[in-house]
């Protein structure tokens, strides 16, 4: 509420014009009233309400605030004005002999927090039961100010009905001196703001000067004596304001009190000199030039952006109708100012209020996109009702008032829908039903579909959630401009709906799409805009989505619809042949609806960007569908009506529509897709060829294969073929394959089978002898000694051979080079793939061994654990007789002897082995039968 309190202090003269808080004088930091061209001390309190007066055609002597109210001319022409409504300026003329009153800090009780800080023109608003101070304007004020309107609320009368004209010589009462004591600490600074700041303070009191109608109380003691008592009363009165503010702190109240002091007649005594008037009159020309120059620069920059040709093929446009908007604030018919009053020190992304709905909620607009020209010569109509008229040239009955309690009227002229979209960003004019229950109701930057039927006025839900204004990114602009031709075709088809939608609740709102409104891209729509249960395309979907979806789907108004990711899309209305054809010809873009609460259009654009090189089939990747489903607006609504009534539609070959669709896809820069024509028998079929497109696209999650027979009376659901191009080999299968591969390499490189079966006697003998000698050496010597001897033997052989070859080459004078050069050039590096393959092979055995050990030691099976125990008990006796090396020697002997013996006596060995196996099995069964746990296990 600190911003609100600061924004409403503009009707009174401020004492903090010395630069203490220049940003709060005109409506909070960054508000247009801050008057940056005048410097830190240039913005006084009397111009804090509307700096647009500074930019108007009025002479400097008429630049006054719109907050001075005359006690003799306050009347209410219409007693139906609700409390809290805003008066858009008051034509109040001060009369001679009477002391006009200034309503101090006229605040609106139902004004939401954070809305006043963005206002361009702070309208004079009044709320009941608010204690106010009544400073006056002297009779000798130069050229009585002319204000904007003579309409006030009936609630204003209670503030001024008891005020009597003051005698110029009468001593000021307590109500007149209420707030001057707060400004006593700043009286010296006020004196220095006269036309001659270098002169002494006494010289600044100009009683006869037309530019200095006020007098300065130089004597601080006199100031305290006159205004001390009434300051306390005013402090008590202003203290009651805390009951009307939601979250006003004492610091905020002190800030309000510190900026206000009343004005008195010159004849009645001492008056503080208005530093603002002196500086305002002396710097009016400079301020006008500076503000005009900065605003013109901003307009030029914005117009240059808007004229960028992002898509050369989007030049085919119809005549554009200007979108003119009448804004609240100063009377444009009187001032005829086309320069919007903005704060030039703020960021270009600052939101500027254009008009107010429900008396408090502004429609914000970015100052960087401000290209709107205020309507001249037309007074703002309809102060007592908030309406927004959207009239389309070619769309009858598209002007829809929405009831409300605001005091702003915005008239928008919309173009014919048969024109194509502009080559810049798409504009949007939408209806807003603001109930005032949302503090920061804004409008999301979404596109309204022309197929929406909502002529019936519906109130907004009271539990509307505040939504944040979505900034339009450059990628969104480019994506929007690249789909203009498709939208143009859709709107030509949507014109046919006029003949089939005549009910009051199904009037088309096609006129709400304006190509002349690129500057309204940040204009906001409440997320909970009430709508009827009619089919429409979700506003979050881009134009390409609308042209690609080939299924007539219903749009639930509830925001809690379940997500349909990966499910079949239900064709609730029945798919017409036109819909199926549009679904088949559209390609490479997903019909996506991602209506999440902040991040709506970016997800859709990412999905579309990922699908540039996908299969030439219709992709219905519905990602997190949370509020509505998609509907194809390219289908003809006459056939849609017949489907709804139960009639069986007939398939008619529409070659022209197919060609238009293909041409639109070409203009979008996508791949050309050859659409199949319908057969004479009325059979429309498109088969899914998994080899027809690139197979390396991992973004495709689902493909739709739509096939319809000759009897299209019964709507068929699209068959969704899930893309299973993922490697079908599981991790276990891959590991087994690697194992087989490694074993095959080992068997091929080292023929173990041939080696142990003595296929090559020399090779087998060499290997057998070497290993046996090494094992015998390990039995006789230590491991270190054996390894050292082996290395010495190897080196002795290689060195001897190297020296021998060198001697031979020296004797023969040959250049054969190194004798081991062929072996030195061999690449024996182990690649990461090979290492991983070996590790995978080893890990299989390691994991198997670990699992077996856990099973045995944790007694998963009692018999297996007992077997291990018996084996280990026998090994204790073996270890007492043999050591490890001896066992290895015996194992080698068996390896090189048993296979060849078994090969020779296989039949006899198999017979005796079978007998031994049967005997062992019978013994094990007898043991298991006597154990208690085993019997229960078998019974189970």
UniProtKB/Swiss-Prot annotation:
Skewed-composition ranges (Low complexity): 1-24
Subcellular location: Endoplasmic reticulum membrane; Golgi apparatus membrane
Subunit and interaction comment: Homodimer. Interacts with RTN4. Isoform 2 interacts with BACE1, BACE2, BCL2 and FADD. Interacts with ATL2. Interacts with TMEM33. Interacts with ATL1. Interacts with ZFYVE27 and with KIF5A in a ZFYVE27-dependent manner. Interacts with RIGI. Interacts with TRIM25.
Tissue expression remark: Present in olfactory bulb, olfactory epithelium and retina (at protein level).
Lineage: superkingdom: Eukaryota
Region: Interaction with BACE1, residue numbers: 908-910
Residue list for modification Phosphoserine: 31, 196, 204, 209, 212, 249, 282, 508, 575-576, 652
Organism: Rattus norvegicus (Rat)
Name of the protein: Reticulon-3
Keyword annotations from UniProtKB, A to Z: Acetylation, Apoptosis, Endoplasmic reticulum, ER-Golgi transport, Golgi apparatus, Membrane, Phosphoprotein, Transmembrane, Transmembrane helix, Transport
Record Pfam families: Reticulon
Entry function: May be involved in membrane trafficking in the early secretory pathway. Inhibits BACE1 activity and amyloid precursor protein processing. May induce caspase-8 cascade and apoptosis. May favor BCL2 translocation to the mitochondria upon endoplasmic reticulum stress. Induces the formation of endoplasmic reticulum tubules. Acts also as an inflammation-resolving regulator by interacting with both TRIM25 and RIGI, subsequently impairing RIGI 'Lys-63'-linked polyubiquitination leading to IRF3 and NF-kappa-B inhibition.
GO biological process: apoptotic process; brain development; endoplasmic reticulum tubular network formation; endoplasmic reticulum tubular network organization; negative regulation of amyloid-beta formation; neuron differentiation; vesicle-mediated transport
Biased composition, class Basic and acidic residues, residue ranges: 472-490
């Amino acid at each position: 509420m600190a911003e609100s309190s600061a924004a409403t202090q503009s009707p009174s003269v401020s004492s903090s014009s010395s630069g203490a808080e220049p940003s709060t004088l005109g409506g909070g930091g960054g508000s247009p009233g801050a008057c940056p061209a005048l410097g830190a001390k240039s913005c006084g309190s009397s111009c804090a309400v509307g700096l647009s007066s500074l930019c108007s055609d009025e002479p400097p002597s008429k630049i006054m605030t719109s907050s001075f109210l005359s006690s003799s001319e306050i009347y209410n022409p219409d007693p139906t004005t609700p409390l809290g409504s805003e008066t858009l300026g008051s034509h109040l003329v001060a009369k001679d002999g009477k002391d006009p009153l200034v309503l101090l800090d006229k605040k609106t009780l139902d004004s939401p927090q954070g809305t006043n800080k963005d206002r361009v023109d702070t309208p004079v608003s009044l709320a009941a039961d608010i204690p106010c101070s009544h400073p006056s304007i002297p009779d000798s004020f130069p050229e009585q100010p002319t204000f904007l309107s003579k309409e006030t609320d009936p609630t204003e009368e209670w503030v001024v009905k008891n005020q009597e004209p003051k005698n110029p010589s009468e001593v000021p009462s307590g109500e007149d001196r209420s707030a001057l004591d707060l400004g006593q600490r700043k009286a010296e600074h006020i004196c220095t703001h006269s036309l001659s700041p270098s002169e002494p303070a006494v010289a600044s009191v100009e009683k006869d000067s037309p530019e200095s109608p006020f007098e300065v109380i130089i004597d601080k003691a006199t100031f305290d004596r006159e205004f001390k008592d009434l300051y306390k009363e005013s402090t008590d009165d202003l203290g009651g304001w805390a009951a009307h503010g939601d979250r006003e702190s004492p610091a905020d109240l002190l800030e309000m009190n510190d900026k206000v002091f009343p004005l008195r007649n010159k004849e009645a005594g001492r008056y503080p000199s208005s530093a603002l008037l002196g500086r305002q009159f002396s710097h009016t020309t400079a301020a006008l030039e500076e503000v005009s120059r900065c605003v013109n620069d901003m307009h030029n920059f914005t117009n240059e952006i808007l004229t960028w040709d992002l898509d050369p093929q989007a030049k085919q446009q119809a005549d554009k109708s200007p979108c003119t908007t009448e804004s609240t604030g100063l009377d444009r018919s009187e001032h005829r100012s086309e320069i919007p009053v903005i704060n030039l020190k703020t960021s270009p992304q600052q939101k500027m209020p254009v008009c107010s709905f429900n008396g408090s909620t502004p429609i914000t607009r970015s100052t960087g996109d401000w290209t709107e020209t205020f309507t001249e010569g037309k007074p703002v109509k309809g102060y007592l009702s908030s309406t927004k008229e959207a009239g389309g040239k070619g769309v009858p009955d598209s002007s829809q008032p929405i009831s409300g309690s605001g005091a702003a009227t915005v008239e928008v002229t919309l173009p014919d829908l048969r024109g194509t979209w502009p080559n810049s960003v798409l504009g949007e004019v939408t209806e807003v039903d603001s109930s005032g229950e949302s503090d920061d109701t804004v409008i999301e930057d979404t596109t309204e579909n022309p197929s929406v039927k909502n002529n019936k006025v519906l109130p907004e839900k009271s539990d509307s959630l505040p939504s944040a204004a979505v900034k339009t990114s450059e990628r969104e602009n480019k994506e929007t401009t690249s789909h203009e031709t498709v939208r143009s075709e859709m709107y030509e088809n949507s014109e046919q709906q006029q003949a089939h939608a005549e009910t009051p609740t199904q009037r088309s709102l096609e006129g709400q799409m304006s190509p002349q409104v690129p500057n309204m891209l940040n204009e906001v729509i409440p997320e909970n805009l009430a709508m009827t249960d009619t089919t429409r395309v979700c506003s979050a979907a881009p134009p390409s989505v609308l042209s690609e979806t080939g299924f007539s789907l219903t749009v639930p108004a509830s925001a809690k619809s379940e997500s349909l990711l990966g499910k079949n899309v239900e064709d609730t209305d029945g798919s017409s042949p036109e819909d199926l054809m549009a679904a088949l010809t559209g390609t490479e873009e997903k019909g996506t609806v991602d209506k999440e609460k902040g991040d709506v259009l970016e997800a859709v654009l990412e999905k579309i960007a990922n699908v540039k090189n996908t299969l030439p089939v219709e992709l219905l990747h519905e990602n997190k569908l949370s509020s509505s489903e998609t509907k194809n607006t390219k289908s003809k609504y006459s056939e849609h009506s017949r489907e709804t009534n139960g009639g069986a539609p007939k398939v008619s070959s529409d070659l022209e529509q197919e060609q238009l669709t293909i041409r639109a896809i070409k203009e979008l820069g996508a791949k050309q897709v050859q659409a199949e024509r319908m057969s004479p028998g009325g059979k429309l079929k498109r088969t899914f060829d998994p080899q027809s497109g690139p197979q390396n696209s991992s973004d495709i999650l689902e493909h739709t294969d739509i096939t319809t027979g000759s009897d299209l009376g019964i709507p068929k659901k699209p068959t969704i073929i899930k893309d299973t191009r993922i490697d079908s080999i599981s991790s276990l299968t891959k590991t087994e394959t690697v194992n087989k591969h490694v074993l095959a390499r080992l068997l091929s490189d080292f023929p173990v089978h041939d080696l142990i079966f003595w296929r090559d006697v020399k090779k087998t003998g060499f290997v057998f002898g070497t290993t046996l000698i090494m094992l015998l050496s390990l039995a006789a010597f230590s491991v270190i000694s054996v390894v050292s001897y082996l290395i010495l033997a190897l080196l002795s052989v290689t060195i001897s051979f190297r020296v021998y070859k060198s001697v031979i080459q020296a004797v023969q004078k040959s250049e054969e080079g190194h004798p081991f050069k062929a072996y030195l050039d061999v690449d024996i590096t182990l690649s990461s793939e090979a290492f991983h393959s070996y590790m995978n092979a080893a890990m299989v055995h390691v994991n198997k061994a670990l699992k077996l050990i856990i099973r045995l030691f944790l007694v998963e099976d009692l018999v297996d654990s007992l077997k291990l125990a018996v084996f280990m008990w026998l090994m204790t006796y073996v270890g007492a007789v043999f050591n490890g090396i001896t066992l290895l020697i015996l194992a080698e002997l068996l390896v090189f002897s048993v296979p060849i013996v078994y090969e020779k006596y296989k039949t006899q060995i198999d017979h005796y082995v079978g007998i031994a196996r049967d005997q062992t099995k019978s013994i094990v069964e007898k043991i298991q039968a006597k154990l208690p746990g085993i019997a229960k296990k078998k019974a189970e």
